[in-house]
Amino acid sequence: MIGMSRNLCIVTTIVALGAVSLTARPGPQAPVAPPQGAPQRPPQQPGEISTTITGGGGAAPRLAVPDFIALAADAETTATARLVGQILFDDITFEREFALIPRDTYATIPAAKSFDDVPVDRWRELNADGVVVGTVQKTAGGVHLEVRLVNVRTRIASFSRSYDGSNANPRLFAHTISDELHETQRGLRGVARTKLTFDSDRDGERISGTIENRSVKEIYISDYDGSNQRRVTVTRSLNVMPTWSPDARSIAYTSFKRIVPNIFISNIYQGTMEELTQGGSSNTLAAWSPDGGKLCFVSNRDGNLELYVVNRDGSNLRRVTNHPSADTVPTWSPSGSQLAFVSDRTGPPQIYTIDADGLGLRRVTTSESYADRPTWSPDGREIAYAARTGPGNDIKVVELASGQVRQLTFGEGTNESPSWAPNSRHLSFNSTRSGRTQIFVMGRDGKNVKQITNAGSNFQPNWSK
């Protein structure tokens, strides 16, 4: 039976992890409402501008990103200025849209004390096209930041913004600046304010009464770069396969807290937990529709494992697949008109697509001995998945229009559970390449691999939209 049994069990409240509220203007806006204390954009000021800076000969612009200028000598303001500059450098590096001048070369450049004494000529000696200059000032309510991207050829700011907010999470200022800078300068939606969710056994607890003394797994979230890791569930049971709602406010996941697996939804800001599915059947592997109004999941309620779709409030349950074999691991197309999933209907598990109404079945993987965990790219062009490549698995991507497959990982441990970043330029995945299973991120070309978890073992990441 499907229902929305509302369990007001309070889960861990997540503080200062939302996106930033921005003034209205063309381009993507923050995906979620900001939590208390997040930096706010004041009304657009006459001096705030956005023009495009370019590199020489059509190359990517070369930028310098030194520490921000602390307009007060206290330790907190100084630390914030240093941290925002470093995190902004890291955020810009991650997107690979600019050529960053290494920070260890900045020692020869005199530090500016204000926007009026930026040593533009010295930055030009390092072949910079632009330098990001920012100031941090303490206020009664927190801090005030101003930032400019100065074109070293024209000495004019190509980008100018100001922000006010709490100093509780200074990383969020850097993430906000990075996303706005990429949007205005490169026409790109950045991912610095996005989140990851994953399941982890890091707490070291064991589930009593299980023959194998199974580890407790809880749901965690973090910033895209692995910072600000927070525990979401506190059930002391097995909680796995989390997935973000499109508004990045809720997480659906499979929980064994009542022995039989069912799907729960936790709102990370309200601290509530809802039980979407109930009963004696197995209900697992939830996937949100792009509009957030439905979830697809896997259930054996009618015998074997099939795909079902249900409204967010638990109403209007309908079956999508109907085959004697097992159909599992659904993922929605960005349009919401199709689903990709795994089925063993022709032998070993393979990736298929099907229309959301259950028609139009198509096999996607044709050359794999085993394919699992599909994830549809937000631009709709590709599906990433885990494929058997030997003793372990590797991440591959298939282009839907041509069927062309490219491999992203190559036998460094077992690599599974890919999940796309919302701009289709990066993927997260879990891998055993460093020993225990950990979460990694990489570019869509398989380059710039970075491990972002270390505590315990961590599995099945999902990137917020």
Regions found by a protein language model. Give the residues of each.
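Short beta-strand->alpha-helix linker/helix-N-cap micro-motif
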Residues: 45-119, 132-138
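Structural motif
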Residues: 142-144, 205-220, 260-264, 304-308, ...
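Multi-bladed beta-propeller domains
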Residues: 223-240, 266-284, 310-326, 354-372, ...
